[in-house]
């Protein structure tokens, strides 16, 4: 398995993979899927230019995707992690996360953050194994800094 940093030249591949991820996660009736289904090549290329997109290839088939962007000079935010249902449980998420974290290190980031659904035990386990910890809301000490069903987690890079 190999991680690929997608570039603007890969926009067709990215579009197909992203739409596959949305269809699997939310269904084709979802508003986000319908919106992105109508994206032009220019819109897909812009996404690849503005945020880092990493895909994982397994025997010539893309089986996972993660997005990352520099939230501030010292911070990277990861989002939209997806693995193909047929590839789950084979280390795809961990491999993609590691690539995105390494990208953050190369940028000089000292913190990586992400959000995860509170009931996604598989994802929580992977994040915790990689060293991510729940981020407390400084105002009330709760573990919720986003929507009620999501948990914000962070990883401190050395």
What are these regions (language model features)?
Residues 5-86, 97-99, 103, 135-138, ...:
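Acetyl-CoA-dependent GNAT
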Residues 83, 89-102, 106, 124-129:
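Conserved acetyl-CoA-binding loop-helix of GNAT-fold acetyltransferases
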Residues 110-113, 117-124, 129-158:
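C-terminal "cap" of GNAT-fold acetyltransferases
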């Amino acid at each position: 398995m190999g991680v690929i940093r997608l570039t603007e030249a890969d926009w067709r591949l990215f579009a197909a993979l992203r739409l596959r991820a949305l269809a699997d996660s939310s269904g084709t009736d979802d508003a986000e899927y319908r919106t992105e289904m109508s994206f032009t090549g220019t819109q897909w290329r812009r996404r690849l230019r503005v945020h880092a997109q990493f895909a994982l290839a397994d025997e010539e088939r893309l089986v996972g995707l993660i997005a990352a962007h520099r939230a501030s000079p010292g911070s990277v935010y990861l989002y939209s992690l997806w693995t193909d249902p047929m590839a789950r449980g084979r280390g795809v998420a961990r491999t993609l996360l590691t690539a995105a974290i390494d990208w953050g290190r190369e940028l000089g980031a000292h913190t990586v953050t992400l959000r995860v659904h509170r009931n996604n035990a598989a994802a929580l386990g992977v994040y915790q194994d990689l060293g991510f910890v729940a981020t407390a809301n400084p105002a009330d000490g709760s573990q919720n800094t986003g929507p009620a069903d999501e948990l914000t987690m962070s990883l401190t890079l050395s």
